[in-house]
């Protein structure tokens, strides 16, 4: 299977995790970058993320180039307010074709995946197999076991 790693990370935790996954697979990790960067101040960041989430604000992102022969998309992202961050939703809306499999990986897993599966399902075809992995860059064993089976 041809894999591609795409990630969104504001603090750097999910970036490190995505790079580790990409290195394991001999790939590069492609970032999802909002055109309007998020503030580094925690209060300002959470205020903006909360407003985007609950008002369903579309967040513009820089173009993400994906290989045409990819059948497995490994999407690494935090979970903000029990759902995917709005830049990730913009990315999903811009996908040009279906994927056989999407593996969603999140670092800083605390309360579960919330609405993430529902949101992924909303933007990808029903034929796409969605897998969810809670992991950290320090404990890579769960990710390795899933990736070995792909």
Per-segment meaning from a language model:
Residues 1-75, 82-89, 93, 126, ...:
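N-terminal beta1-alpha1-beta2 submodule of the flavodoxin-like/Rossmannoid cofactor-binding fold
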Residues 37-43, 114-115, 139-142:
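Short, charged, surface-exposed secondary-structure boundary motifs
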Residues 106-112:
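Short beta-alpha junction loops
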Residues 97-101, 126:
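A short helix->loop->beta-strand "cap" motif at the edges of active sites that frequently abuts
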Residues 115-126:
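Short, aromatic/basic amphipathic alpha-helical patches
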Residues 78-81, 109:
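Short glycine-rich anion-binding loops that position phosphate/pyrophosphate groups of nucleotides
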Residues 128-150:
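Glycine-rich phosphate/pyrophosphate-binding loop and the adjoining helix
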Residues 75-76, 104:
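Redox-cofactor binding/interface segments in oxidoreductases and associated redox assembly factors
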């Amino acid at each position: 299977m041809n894999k591609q790693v795409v990630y969104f990370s504001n603090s750097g935790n999910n970036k490190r995790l995505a790079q580790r996954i990409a290195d394991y697979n001999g790939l590069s990790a492609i970032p999802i970058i909002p055109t309007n960067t998020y503030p580094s101040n925690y209060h300002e960041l959470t205020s903006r993320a909360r407003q985007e989430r609950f008002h369903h604000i579309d967040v513009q992102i820089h173009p993400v180039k994906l290989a045409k022969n990819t059948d497995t998309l490994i999407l690494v992202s935090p979970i903000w307010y029990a759902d995917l961050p709005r830049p990730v939703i913009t990315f999903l809306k811009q996908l040009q074709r279906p994927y056989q499999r999407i593996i969603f990986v999140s670092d800083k897993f605390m309360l579960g995946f919330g609405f993430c599966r529902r949101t992924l399902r909303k933007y990808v075809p029903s034929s796409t197999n969605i897998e969810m992995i809670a992991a950290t860059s320090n404990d890579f064993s769960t990710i390795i076991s899933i990736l070995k089976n792909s």
